[in-house]
Regions:
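Acidic, metal/ion-coordinating pockets
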Residues: 3-304
């Protein structure tokens, strides 16, 4: 396996042999919360040519699968429908950025996709479908809500299960409408089913306590249990900052990758830091882990 952070690389295989494997590897990139208009007086920044650094754009374009947490709704509906401190929404045109930068999957398992209730969720699903963008982790019935996103390439089979903790939009509080619950037995069922079908199984989780630099013990227990049930990797987001990672029973757990783009004027310094987690797969095994750190600025995103 190769583990990298920025430009640092640690390889367990000779460089020449590693290069010969690169063409066969399947590369997956994961990002945290994306709500580009949140906290900004100027919207539509994602359409600026300098919004992303060239290196990050290159990673996206070369990757086989790019995944983020869509921490917002895509709706042109009423100004407010849910009593909460902050309501997030983007115009459908925001999805042009995801499509043009080779994103394949938007996780909807989070605490903002239901900000505009069922109407907002329905519109979000409609607009994602209109851009041919995959989505998982939310819906109008439990079979759909807990259905993993499946991806296959070069004989690699990947299953991504998108789940969240028990906030207002969770399906367990809304009669089976809303977001997938990380503690549901259905998550374990989907992990076991995915593994039985030969999939490399990743659980993409929106959970935790905001602004804690380390995951609390109960989150560590939940994420480790996902691995114990068969998950090959767990990637977390929601705490607004980057937290630690570990290898547990051979599986990487990233407790929080921070934001992809969720800006708050006057916010904490650490909430402007994010990570791209890049995984390499070959023969159903994890061959590479690359962590690319970046900083969210008022008008764009810069690499560290």
């Amino acid at each position: 396996m190769i583990c990298t952070f920025g430009d640092l690389s640690f390889a367990s295989t000779p460089a020449a042999h590693t290069s010969s494997l690169d063409e066969q590897e399947v590369t997956l990139n994961f990002f945290g919360d994306w709500a580009p208009s949140s906290g900004r007086s100027q919207i539509g920044l994602q359409h600026r040519p300098d919004y992303l650094p060239e290196t990050l754009s290159s990673h996206l374009n070369r990757s086989d699968l790019n995944v983020l947490n869509l921490e917002t709704t895509i709706t042109q509906g009423p100004a407010t429908l849910r009593a909460t401190t902050r309501l997030f929404r983007e115009q459908p045109s925001a999805l042009e950025f995801l499509k043009s930068h080779n994103f394949n999957l938007a996780s909807l398992a989070n605490n903002h996709v239901m900000d505009y209730l069922e109407v907002g969720l329905e519109e979000t699903l409609k607009h994602l479908d209109s851009f041919s963008l995959g989505h998982a982790g939310a819906g109008f019935d439990r079979d759909t809500i807990y259905q993993p996103y499946r991806f296959e390439k070069n004989a690699e089979k990947i299953s991504i299960i998108c789940v969240a903790d028990g906030e207002l939009g969770n399906e367990k509080f809304n009669n089976g409408v809303g977001t997938a619950d990380v503690t549901s037995f259905r998550v374990v069922d989907q992990i076991r089913k995915s593994k039985a079908e030969g999939c490399f199984t990743i659980v993409f989780v929106h959970a935790g306590i905001e602004f804690l630099p380390y995951p609390p013990p109960f989150i560590q227990d939940i994420y480790r249990n996902l691995v114990a049930q068969g998950a090959d990797c767990v990637i977390g987001h929601h705490p607004h900052i980057v937290q630690g990672m570990e290898f547990y029973s051979g599986a990487p757990i990233f407790y929080s990758v921070g934001h992809f783009d969720l800006y708050r004027e006057g916010g904490r310094t650490d909430e402007r830091l994010g990570l791209m987690v890049s995984l390499g797969l070959l023969d159903a095994q994890l061959t590479k882990v690359n962590l690319l750190p970046f900083r969210i600025e008022e008008h764009n995103i810069n690499l560290l």
